[in-house]
Amino acid sequence: MTDVLASAERVLRDGIGLTEPELRAVLDVDDDSLPRLLDLAHRVRRRWCGPGVEIEGIVSVKTGGCPEDCHFCSQSGRFDSPVRSAWLDIPNLVTAAEQTAATGATEFCIVAAVRGPDDRLMRQVRAAVRAIREAVDINISCSLGILTPDQAAELAEIGVHRYNHNLETARSYFPSVVTTHTWEERWQTLQLVRAAGMEVCCGGILGMGESLDQRAEFAAQLADLDPDEVPLNFLDPRPGTPFADLPVVSVAEALRAAAMFRLALPRTILRFAGGREITLGDAGTRDALRGGVNGLIVGNYLTTLGRDPAADLALLAELGEPIRRSELQALSQAL
């Protein structure tokens, strides 16, 4: 335990993430030492990311009917899931962006359940980005699956600020989660995103049956990628999917994982996303915001309910954590 805390102190001092063996040791920290680990992760975040928590809202432009077989996902058309295919029109997307901005969020992410965007989806996204930019001062992100070079360039050109494409899990465990495409295909899309000039958002889901060794492997692989944002999800088992009967990650396990990712990526936005309500609850979320996490998705997720945004904003105020503003919002308020 002393070695783990000494390693964390080194990250605080130098801003260089832990090695994979060191990350693995973080996951063995006992419950009695967990508060000290979380405090160190929080201090690392404050030193290397600064104060404040970034708020984001997400909306699904195309829900369900996905041809891929991601075993955690109720939107796959291959599983006996209650989710059915549907599209959201432009006025509703603009309304969702306005509601997100009203919470103080800096990011609004347009998500589609697809392998990758076809011409119809790209037309819809172009129109949505144009309409939202005319109506709302908020950064627009997208999560549309696997991209071609031309698609990545077009998204950057129309003003997409950040692109999300999760690696989901360690490279060694990925074939147990998805069989219809490869980890390497996802990695390649992330390289296209960066080359096009967009910020890279890449994280994954914990609790899909991976080992602790593979969690540390995943954190080290994300550190190699060095994304601008890492969304950290916890499996919320969905009926009809292959992972429907997996157990939910415990609070202590989730907090150790959050601290590990912060110590792997001292300068990255580490955002709690899907599953935090069922895994952490209010008390666990509070501990995590004092344990390395500096981003939240507010409101509902793609197919599951989230927390009331007002409750998250009240929690941030209670903790004395300001909401981070984007350059776009700062410029708008200055004018």
UniProtKB/Swiss-Prot annotation:
[2Fe-2S] cluster binds at C109, C142, C201, R271. SUPFAM superfamilies: Radical SAM enzymes (SSF102114). SMART domains: BATS, Elp3. Coiled coil: none annotated. [4Fe-4S] cluster binds at C66, C70, C73. PROSITE patterns: RADICAL_SAM. Binds 1 [4Fe-4S] cluster. The cluster is coordinated with 3 cysteines and an exchangeable S-adenosyl-L-methionine. Binds 1 [2Fe-2S] cluster. The cluster is coordinated with 3 cysteines and 1 arginine. Its EC number is 2.8.1.6. Belongs to the radical SAM superfamily. Biotin synthase family. HAMAP family: BioB. This is Biotin synthase. It comes from Acidothermus cellulolyticus (strain ATCC 43068 / DSM 8971 / 11B). The gene is bioB.
